[in-house]
């Protein structure tokens, strides 16, 4: 009996010793996962949102829980090429969707993700790209089955075509939003151009009036100088007789 008890105690000790490395390994794996860097797309996006020099185009919202693209046209034209080597705003929006961002409101381009916060850059490591849903594949050549196949042999619902239509609808919606934003931007530029033209016309008119006033005073001064010269030529007279 004592041998059996000692054997059980030995087994307990062994289990305790084995348990410690296991917990340690779990802890290490968690730490390693936490140290994984965020995707480059998120790093670049966070950087441009954080940059105070671009606040007129893109910046955090008032609470720091999301960011707003204030000027989509300028953002696509000036900033996107320096960040992602393209100028397609719709593509940028689709990328945000794949990382779980959502459009907060319909009145402006505001996007939010609970792991994308002002002053909490480390949270981005928890954001991962959504895995696209796999379509059915041909067993012989592993090519994608045409999307006209609506239902599989077991009667399950279609799995690929819905996702494809959602992507197309999202792309079309983003394109329409971009088109509307560009129209609004163009309208604002036209209004500003008309205002500047009006101000320029007023400035030219004032400048012309000023030049006319200067010319008039210059002419009066020349006339006064000529009269003074004539009086000096007449000399001094006494009872109408010129004194020598």
From Swiss-Prot:
PROSITE patterns: HSF_DOMAIN (PS00434). Disulfide bonds: none annotated. Residues 220-234 have a biased composition (Acidic residues). Residues 38-132 bind DNA. The lineage of its organism: Eukaryota, Viridiplantae, Streptophyta, Embryophyta, Tracheophyta. Exhibits temperature-dependent phosphorylation. Residues 173-218 are annotated as: Hydrophobic repeat HR-A/B. Homotrimer. Residues 216-244 are annotated as: Disordered. The gene is HSFB3. The hydrophobic-rich region (HR-A/B) corresponds to the oligomerization domain. This is Heat stress transcription factor B-3. Its main location: cytoplasm. SUPFAM superfamilies: Winged helix' DNA-binding domain. It is found in: Cytoplasm; Nucleus. GO terms for molecular function: DNA-binding transcription factor activity; sequence-specific DNA binding. Pfam families: HSF_DNA-bind. The keyword Calcium does not apply. A motif (Nuclear export signal) lies at residues 236-243.
């Amino acid at each position: 009996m004592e041998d059996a008890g000692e054997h059980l105690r030995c087994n307990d000790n062994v289990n305790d010793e084995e348990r410690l490395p296991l917990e340690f390994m779990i802890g290490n794996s968690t730490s390693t996962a936490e140290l994984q860097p965020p995707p480059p797309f998120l790093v670049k996006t966070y950087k441009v949102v954080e940059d105070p020099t671009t606040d007129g185009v893109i910046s955090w919202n008032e609470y720091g829980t999301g960011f707003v693209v204030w000027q989509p046209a300028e953002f696509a034209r000036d900033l996107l090429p320096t960040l992602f080597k393209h100028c397609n705003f719709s593509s940028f929006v689709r990328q945000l969707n794949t990382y779980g961002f959502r459009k907060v409101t319909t009145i402006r381009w505001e996007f939010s993700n609970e792991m994308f916060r002002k002053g909490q850059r480390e949270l981005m490591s928890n954001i991962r790209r959504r895995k696209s849903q796999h379509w059915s594949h041909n067993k012989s050549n592993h090519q994608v089955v045409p999307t006209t196949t609506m239902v599989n042999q077991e009667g399950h619902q279609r799995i690929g075509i819905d996702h494809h239509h959602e992507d197309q609808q999202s792309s079309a919606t983003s394109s329409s939003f971009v088109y509307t934003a560009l129209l609004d931007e163009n309208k604002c530029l036209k209004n500003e151009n008309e205002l500047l033209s009006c101000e320029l016309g007023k400035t030219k008119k004032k400048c012309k009036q000023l030049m006319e006033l200067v010319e008039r005073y210059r002419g009066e001064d020349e006339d006064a100088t000529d009269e003074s010269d004539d009086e000096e030529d007449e000399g001094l007279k006494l009872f109408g007789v010129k004194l020598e």
